[in-house]
Design a protein with these regions (language model features):
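Gly/Ser/Thr-rich helix-start
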Residues: 11, 93, 115, 122, ...
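Glycine-rich loop-to-alpha-helix module at the N-terminal edge of alpha/beta enzyme cores
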Residues: 32-119, 130
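Short glycine/serine/threonine-biased micro-segments
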Residues: 8, 13, 90, 119, ...
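Short capping/connector residues at structural and topological boundaries
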Residues: 12-13, 17-18, 100, 124, ...
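Residue-level signature of catalytic and energy-coupling elements of molecular machines
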Residues: 10, 29, 65, 109, ...
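Conserved strand-loop elements at the edges of beta-sheets that form or border functional pockets
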Residues: 25, 37, 137
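Conserved small-residue-rich beta-alpha loop and adjacent elements
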Residues: 122-143
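Hydrophobic face of amphipathic alpha-helices that form TPR/SEL1-like repeat modules
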Residues: 1-27, 34
């Protein structure tokens, strides 16, 4: 039986809990894998690592971030058939519907590739009667 472990800090890790959950194919009802369940310490560790990654990412210049997103886009396109098959197995969708879901997700990544020019913030005068609009880039952090 396939075991799905945790993916934290760019690595597959088993976690400290020995508890597992069953993963079913929703179209067939058959069990297709088991997933390792996280303990509270596994969760806290993952959140701390995500906070550190956020700090590193937030100081990275927008052009470097765009390069990462373009590489992500390239990987999605290169592996689209395999990813579509995973969506079929995980969500019970027919292939064409799963392909559409992947395409919609890819569109979000494509939008993110072009977003660096929007990160600058802006000021617009008189967007309404005696109303000016000002925006600034302010990362939210780990949510």
């Amino acid at each position: 039986m396939k075991i799905i472990e945790h993916f934290v800090d760019g690595k597959i890790v088993p976690g400290s809990s020995k508890k597992k959950g069953k993963v079913f194919n929703p179209a067939t009802g058959e069990q297709q894998a088991e997933v390792m369940l996280a303990s509270s310490s596994d969760l806290n560790n993952a959140v701390e690592i995500a906070k550190k990654a956020f700090n590193d990412w937030s100081i990275r210049p927008p052009l470097q971030r765009a390069r990462v997103m373009f590489k992500f886009k390239e990987l999605i396109e290169k592996n689209s058939d395999e990813l579509t098959k995973m969506i079929v197995a995980e969500h019970g969708k027919v292939y064409e519907d799963a392909k559409g879901s992947l395409t919609r997700g890819l569109e979000v990544v494509e939008f993110a590739c072009g977003i660096p020019h929007l990160l600058k913030g802006e000021f617009s005068e008189n967007v309404g009667t005696n109303v000016d609009s000002w925006s600034m880039r302010q990362p939210l952090g780990v949510v």
